[in-house]
Regions:
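Conserved redox-active cysteine motifs that mediate thiol-disulfide chemistry
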Residues: 1
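Short, well-ordered coil/turn elements that cap or connect secondary structure elements
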Residues: 4-5, 228
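Short, conserved sequence motifs used for protein processing/export or organelle targeting and
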Residues: 6-217
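Residue-level detector of functionally pivotal "anchor" positions at catalytic/ligand-binding pockets or at interdomain
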Residues: 212-229
Length: 230
């Protein structure tokens, strides 16, 4: 995230071992990886052990691929209902396509979650460097960021959200209302991630992350046709 703050969106799913606290699980974020944990995927193209060297190399590789669609989004709390979020996303394709197979999807993530300890496989520098975890004990207190709280179409995309025929730079708009789960601790720390799934490739074509604001405030993030891995 530090290396590519404008091009990288992190989503952390906590659900890979039996002792995962229920409050950290997100059953609606139903895109799963296979293999041992921790595991990472960038745009659902590159999958790897997220040590720093691997992470940077795979993010750079994803950025070099580019994208065929620009994306922006806006998210606001529903007036008088803080547990619901209005979200609108707009896509613009860089070329016309009469056989487009893309879909919108959304996720809610939360930052600043405390009160948890994490088993630390990097304690004592046993497995190399890992962002300071190599100098911590076998059980380390952590502040969790980018935690997946809920997903909306994240596995297959929302059906019929993008038409089969798209024109060059013609805006395609999609709006919906997201219900926040009870696991959200602080709504001031949540963000909405909008992304476009390329159904032909099974990959993420582009994504954008926005803050959720009160109705009337502005929270728009505009992403051009530069690849944005998640």
């Amino acid at each position: 995230v530090e290396q590519y703050p404008d091009n990288f969106i992190a989503i952390a799913k906590h659900n890979y071992y039996q002792e995962t606290p229920e409050a950290l699980k997100s059953p609606t974020y139903d895109y799963d990886l296979t293999g041992t944990w921790p595991y990472c995927t960038v745009d659902r193209i590159f999958t790897f052990d997220p040590v720093p060297a691997n992470s940077l190399a795979n993010v750079r590789a994803a950025l070099e691929l580019g994208t065929s669609v620009a994306l922006d989004a806006v998210a606001t709390f529903v007036p008088e209902n803080p547990n619901r979020v209005n979200v609108s996303a707009t896509a613009q394709f860089t070329a016309a396509d009469n056989e487009a197979n893309y879909r919108f999807a959304f996720a809610v993530v939360e930052d600043g979650i405390t009160g948890y300890k994490q088993n630390n496989a990097y304690a004592g520098n046993k497995n190399g460097e890992m962002g300071g975890f190599e100098s911590k004990g076998s059980s380390a207190s952590v502040t969790l960021n980018h935690v997946a709280r809920s997903g909306y179409g994240v596995k297959e995309g929302i059906e019929n959200s993008i038409p089969q025929s798209v024109n060059e730079y013609n805006p395609i708009n999609y709006s919906t209302v997201l219900d926040l789960p009870s696991t959200v601790i602080n709504r001031d720390n949540i963000k909405v991630v909008a992304f476009i799934i390329n159904k032909k490739k099974g990959s993420i074509e582009n994504a954008v992350q926005v803050n959720v604001t009160e109705q009337g405030e502005t929270a728009i993030a505009d992403v051009n046709a530069t690849q944005t891995p998640d």
